[in-house]
């Protein structure tokens, strides 16, 4: 079976890295097309032996790109088109149906209560999403929370499949040599207690709250490491300066060595205002670090003393950080339930199985004729 993954861009981000992991474990022949910004993850996928094409879009609204994508899909003879992220859902769904692709699947990686991938949920955004959803056979929600948000938004429950993000445990395993090396690289004392955050420097991640909460607790033996880059980095650096902890807060910038960066930490903090899954928290736990988080749907129903949900307020977060630090550095320890539920191999099998079920259903429909009163995506009956 031939599968084409359509994604908005391939800069470093959770959805982009998740796609790479899926490609490494799928049993189907798979290609990738990015609407624009091939970025570092495109290089990673190419390095793995995958094929990545850049559609070359330069604006969000570019109708000729729809024609280019349709021709690319038709020429590739793909059985499945799988779209990831909002913009690629709009273009990918439409192009796939225009190209006559049998199966169209979407994964919704990042839908919050009020925002969809950092864009406000306006009537226009919703109309485009729901309108092109008519072209889709199924939408993968990465958590129950995402599923419920999609249903409230107007997506039919029968079209939603809950398949969580997968975690490659070998990719994020603890490495003592890497711990020593990273601490040397950034001038962090080997015996210091290092708190860390990881992700795109975006307001919704609330790294400013972490800086404010941790600032009074920092000294030469208690440091904060911020891993990631983004437009608000100057604001965060100013926040650290205003709090008088410039020398105690280290900005590592964008990094691709996730396991090494996590290995350098003693406590992980995730203070996002809204979260659809919480992959970074799972990665930290898989590395053996205790984690404090404000929201992490991926941990719903998982009992562990290695992760604790904390208040999203300044004083509340500060108290929880102080309490964790007071107990000293915890030994590295995994959470077996996470491996059982979120291993990338099992998750990818579920996605591959979904493709095959949908393809079989489409084949049966063609053999036995269309079902009555079931309109197709662009007119007529399926």
Please give the residue ranges for each predicted region.
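Carbohydrate-associated surface elements
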Residues: 145, 166
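A conserved mid-protein helix/loop that constitutes part of the nucleotide-sugar donor-binding site
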Residues: 13-21, 193, 197-216, 231-237
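A short helix/loop element that forms part of the nucleotide-sugar donor recognition site in Leloir-type
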Residues: 173-188, 332-335
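Conserved acidic donor-binding segment of nucleotide-sugar-dependent glycosyltransferases
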Residues: 307-315, 323-328
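Aromatic "clamp/platform" in nucleotide-sugar-dependent glycosyltransferases that forms part
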Residues: 254, 273
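Short His-centered aromatic/hydrophobic patch
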Residues: 83-91, 108
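N-terminal strand-loop element at the rim of the active site
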Residues: 5-67, 149, 231
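Short hydrophobic beta-strand element within catalytic cores of glycosyltransferases
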Residues: 34, 290-293
């Amino acid at each position: 079976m031939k599968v084409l993954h359509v994604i908005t861009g391939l800069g470093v981000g959770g959805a982009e890295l998740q796609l790479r992991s899926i490609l490494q474990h799928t049993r189907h022949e798979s290609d990738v097309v990015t609407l624009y910004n091939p970025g570092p993850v495109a290089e990673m996928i190419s390095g793995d032996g995958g094929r990545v094409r850049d559609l070359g879009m330069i604006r969000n609204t570019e109708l000729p790109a729809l024609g280019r994508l349709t021709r690319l899909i038709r020429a590739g003879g793909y059985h499945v088109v799988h779209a990831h992220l909002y913009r690629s859902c709009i273009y990918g769904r439409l192009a796939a149906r225009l190209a006559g692709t049998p199966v169209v699947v979407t994964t919704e990686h990042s839908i919050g209560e009020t925002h969809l991938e950092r864009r406000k949920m306006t009537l226009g955004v919703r109309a485009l999403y729901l309108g092109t959803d008519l072209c889709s056979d199924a939408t993968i929600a990465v958590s129950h929370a995402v599923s419920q948000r999609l249903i409230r938004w107007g997506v039919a429950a029968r079209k939603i499949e809950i398949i969580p993000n997968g975690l490659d445990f070998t990719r994020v395993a603890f490495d003592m040599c890497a711990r020593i090396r990273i601490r040397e690289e950034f001038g962090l004392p080997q015996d210091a207690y290092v708190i860390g955050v990881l992700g795109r420097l975006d307001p919704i991640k609330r790294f400013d709250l972490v800086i404010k909460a941790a600032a009074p607790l920092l000294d030469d033996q208690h440091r904060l490491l911020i891993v990631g880059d983004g437009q608000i980095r100057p604001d965060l650096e100013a926040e650290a300066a205003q709090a008088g902890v410039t020398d105690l807060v280290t900005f590592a910038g964008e990094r691709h060595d996730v396991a090494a960066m996590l290995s350098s930490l003693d406590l992980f903090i995730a203070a996002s205002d809204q979260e659809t899954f919480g992959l970074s928290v799972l990665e930290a736990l898989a590395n053996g670090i205790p984690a404090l988080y404000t929201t992490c749907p991926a941990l719903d129903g998982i009992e562990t003393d290695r992760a604790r949900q904390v208040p999203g307020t300044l004083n509340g977060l500060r108290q929880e950080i102080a309490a964790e630090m007071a107990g000293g550095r915890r030994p590295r320890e995994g959470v077996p339930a996470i491996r059982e539920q979120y291993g990338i191999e099992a998750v990818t099998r579920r996605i591959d199985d979904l493709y095959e079920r949908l393809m079989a259903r489409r084949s049966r429909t063609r053999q036995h004729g269309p079902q009555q009163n079931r309109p197709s995506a662009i007119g007529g009956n399926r």
